[in-house]
C-alpha cells in the first residue's frame, strides 16, 4: 500500500507553519500503519512547492521548522518518493532532497533560488545537493539561484525519473530499488 501526502496551499503550495505541521503529523500517522510500504509526497495541482512562505520571513520561527520536516521525511519508516510537477523550488526542493527517490514531470522546474532574495537555503539543501549531483553541478545551481528543467535535472542526477504522471510512476518504482537507496544525507561528501 502507498500513502499519498499532498502539499495543498494554492496558488503555489508555499510552505508555511500549517504545511510544516501537517507534513510532520501525516508522517507520524503513517508511521503507525504497517500496511504502508511507501509514501508519495506530491503537490496539489500543477505545483510541488514553490518554497517557503515569504510572508513568514523575519517572523519568529514556530515549530516545526523546515529542517525538522526534512529530518522527519528522511527518517520515515518507509521510503518517501517526491513526485513533482511545476515548481519544486527552495524549501520544496529541500523536501524532495530528503526523499529516497525523486520523479518529476517534464515541465518541472527545480532549484534553490532563495539566494536571489538574499536567503541561504537553510534546510540542508546546500549539503544534500552536492552529495547527490556532485560539487560541479551543485556550484552551477546554488550560488546564482539557478533553476533547471526536468531534462537537466535527470541528466545531473537530481531526479531519478521523468514521467508525465509522477504519482503513478511513484507507485511503479520497484520496492527493491527503494530499499537499496540510502538517504542523501548519508551519501559521501564530494
Task: Annotate the PLM regions.
Residues 1-21, 48:
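STAS-typified acidic loop motif
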Residues 35, 42-72, 88, 116-119:
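Glycine- (often His-adjacent) and acidic-residue-rich active-site loop
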Residues 1-9, 26, 31-40:
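Short beta-strand/loop segment at the start of cytosolic alpha/beta domains
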Residues 126-136:
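Hydrophobic, secondary-structure "cap" segments at the distal end of domains
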Residues 72-117, 121:
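Glycine-rich beta-to-alpha active-site loop
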Residues 1-6, 50, 94, 98, ...:
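Amphipathic alpha-helical segments at domain termini/boundaries
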Residues 5, 22-23, 41, 53, ...:
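Terminal peptide-recognition signature
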Amino acid at each position: 500500500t502507498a500513502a499519498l501526502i499532498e502539499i495543498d496551499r494554492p496558488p503555489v503550495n508555499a510552505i508555511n507553519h500549517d504545511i510544516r505541521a501537517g507534513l510532520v503529523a501525516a508522517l507520524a500517522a503513517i508511521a503507525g500503519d504497517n500496511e504502508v510500504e511507501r509514501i508519495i509526497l506530491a503537490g496539489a495541482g500543477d505545483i510541488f512547492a514553490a518554497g517557503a512562505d515569504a510572508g513568514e520571513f523575519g517572523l519568529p520561527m514556530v515549530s516545526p521548522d523546515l529542517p525538522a520536516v526534512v529530518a522527519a521525511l528522511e527518517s520515515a519508516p518507509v521510503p518517501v518518493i517526491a513526485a513533482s510537477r511545476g515548481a519544486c523550488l527552495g524549501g520544496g526542493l529541500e523536501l524532495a532532497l530528503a526523499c529516497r527517490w525523486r520523479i518529476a514531470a517534464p515541465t518541472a522546474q527545480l532549484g534553490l533560488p532563495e539566494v536571489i532574495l538574499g536567503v541561504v537555503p537553510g534546510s540542508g539543501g546546500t549539503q544534500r545537493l552536492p552529495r547527490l549531483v556532485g560539487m560541479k553541478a551543485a556550484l552551477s545551481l546554488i550560488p546564482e539561484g539557478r533553476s533547471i528543467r526536468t531534462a537537466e535535472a535527470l541528466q545531473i542526477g537530481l531526479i531519478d525519473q521523468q514521467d508525465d504522471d509522477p504519482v503513478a510512476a511513484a507507485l511503479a518504482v520497484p520496492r527493491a530499488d527503494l530499499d537499496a537507496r540510502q538517504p542523501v544525507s548519508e551519501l559521501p561528501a564530494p
